[in-house]
């Protein structure tokens, strides 16, 4: 699959991109509490056949990849976390979700390390895509450890449990093992090679238009902005750029992250990443900078499509957020009306009805314009202004700096947000926008919920086993059930696994095609 670019080589705004002076993050600062460094012998022991750790599972995975479509949908949709009030270790941790003991149990029992490994490695067998990948750990004492790396999922799991970070982040694949960077003769030899394209959407960037919440707070009304952003960006990434392997992850509190894992995306240089992020820059400046949307006509196809997606949401925004109800909101709207006579007539009408709802004020624009209140009204300019207003109040507000450089680190899926205790679970993948629309951030399981659910599952299972009939010889030994499978985390891990299998299947197909083109036969050297 090649990357499809939109007809225009520039962003939908029609403006050129500028180079920002991004600063490379320095090495980790000295930590106040000594932390035992990773024993390099664990990751470099000579003669260790890492593949042997995975052979049995790899055979099973290859069979699954042959017969499983990447579009398979997990059988169980995400369900709200359990409301069980049973007493567990988690009961005393409601206000301390990053508690050391709680997090250690979470990593050892619930975190899907193997799935994460296969996603980042692009193969079930260890390779440089994982071994040369940077991880950064935020420890319980707030020390920040950069340039951590691991040869396989088992080593990652062991070190995460040992270090017990409050969270960890994922960085790029480097030219060499990040732990060896200081042994190189030239620092220029250590450079990022590849990384997923990532996008970050934070609802605090909507504070000037959301009236229901501010700062870190969210509710179902303002979460609609996240849903709008997912729908607009996802379809553009697929239809305009040709990307396929896109997954959206809940940040744990007030935002969403997009990860684009296609090989073509991972290998893009920083300039091309800036071009892609610039493609989505429609809003510029702040609320005090005048008109924030200045797009050329005729409209770019991406903007035309976005308007169609956003129109129904705009009407709901007028109801939920009442952006024009306040005097400041009303004045902001009037600033965006291109005809002075029409603007003056609207201001006069609204002055006599200060509590007039936003939906009525929006309708007043057309109704007053139709009365001929302005003799010089340019109806085309008014229509374009209304389109720009709709975009200002609904179009995605991306933190574009996050996606511009390969060196940028982003929080890993399935870590726990220390402030809310919620797990950073997948929202949707495969372009399934019904899943995105149905996602409820308040139903996402908290780390404390998981322990209660395991206890509830165990007690229920034991009761069922006591009522089973038949002799021990007649029973089939069931496979061991992972703890995450006993909780409301299960459908999210299943969704992630379907995404990973689709990616691995694509990688397998690509490798086989490349080998066929080179005239190589057999399986020697195959990554799979």
Q: Model-derived features: where do they sit?
A:
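Acidic, serine/threonine-rich intrinsically disordered low-complexity regions
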Residues: 2, 6-86
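SsDNA-processing nucleotidyl-transfer enzymes
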Residues: 95, 99-215, 400-402, 418, ...
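Catalytic micro-motifs at enzyme active sites that drive phosphoryl/nucleotidyl and oxygen chemistry
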Residues: 182-189, 234-238, 242-250
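Long, well-ordered alpha-helical scaffolding segments within enzyme catalytic domains
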Residues: 217-243
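Long, charge-rich alpha-helical interaction segments
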Residues: 280-389
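Extended, amphipathic alpha-helical scaffolds
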Residues: 429-528
């Amino acid at each position: 699959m090649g990357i499809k670019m939109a007809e225009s080589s520039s962003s939908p705004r029609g403006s050129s991109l500028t180079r920002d002076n991004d600063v490379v993050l320095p090495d980790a600062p000295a930590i106040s509490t000594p932390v035992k460094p990773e024993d390099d012998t664990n990751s470099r022991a000579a003669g260790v056949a890492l593949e042997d750790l995975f052979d049995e599972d790899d055979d099973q995975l290859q069979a699954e990849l042959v017969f499983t479509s990447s579009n398979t949908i997990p059988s169980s949709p995400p369900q709200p976390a359990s409301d069980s009030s049973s007493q567990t270790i988690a009961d005393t941790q409601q206000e301390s979700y990053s508690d050391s003991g709680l997090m250690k149990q979470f990593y050892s029992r619930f975190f899907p390390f193997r799935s994460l490994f296969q996603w980042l490695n692009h193969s079930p067998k260890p390779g440089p895509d994982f071994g040369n990948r940077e991880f950064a750990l935020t420890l319980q004492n707030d020390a920040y450890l950069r340039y951590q790396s691991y040869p396989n999922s088992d080593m990652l799991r062991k070190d995460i449990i040992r270090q017990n970070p409050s969270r960890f982040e994922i960085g790029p694949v480097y030219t060499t093992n990040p732990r060896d960077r200081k042994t190189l003769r030239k620092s220029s030899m250590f450079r990022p090679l590849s990384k997923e394209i990532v996008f970050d959407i934070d609802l605090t960037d909507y504070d000037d238009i959301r009236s229901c919440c501010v700062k870190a707070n969210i509710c179902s009304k303002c979460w609609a902005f996240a849903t709008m952003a997912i729908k607009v960006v996802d379809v553009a990434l697929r239809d305009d750029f040709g990307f396929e392997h896109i997954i959206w992850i809940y940040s744990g509190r007030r935002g969403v992250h997009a990860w684009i894992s296609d090989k073509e995306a991972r290998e893009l240089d920083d300039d091309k990443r800036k071009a892609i992020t610039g493609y989505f820059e429609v809003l510029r400046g702040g609320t005090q900078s005048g008109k924030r949307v200045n797009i050329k006509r005729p409209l770019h196809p991406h903007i035309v499509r976005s308007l169609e997606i956003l129109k129904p949401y705009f009407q709901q925004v007028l109801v939920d957020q009442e952006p024009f109800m306040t005097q400041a909101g009303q004045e902001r709207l009037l600033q965006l009306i291109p005809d002075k006579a029409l603007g003056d007539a609207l201001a006069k009408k609204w002055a006599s009805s200060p509590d007039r709802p936003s939906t009525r004020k929006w309708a007043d624009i057309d109704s007053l314009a139709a009365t001929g209140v302005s003799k010089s009204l340019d109806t085309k300019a008014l229509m374009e202004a209304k389109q720009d207003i709709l975009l200002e109040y609904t179009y995605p507000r991306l933190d574009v700096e996050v996606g511009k450089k390969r060196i940028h680190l982003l929080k890993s899926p399935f870590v726990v947000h220390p402030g809310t205790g919620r797990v950073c679970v997948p929202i949707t993948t495969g372009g399934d926008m019904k899943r995105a629309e149905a996602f409820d951030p308040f139903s996402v399981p908290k780390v404390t919920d998981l322990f209660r659910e395991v206890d509830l599952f165990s007690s229920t299972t034991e009761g069922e086993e006591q009522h089973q009939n038949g002799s021990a010889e007649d029973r089939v030994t069931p496979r061991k059930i992972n703890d995450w499978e006993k909780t409301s985390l299960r459908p999210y891990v299943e969704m992630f696994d379907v995404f990973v299998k689709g990616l691995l299947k694509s990688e397998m197909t690509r490798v086989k095609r490349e080998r066929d083109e080179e005239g190589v036969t057999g399986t020697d050297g195959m990554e799979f």
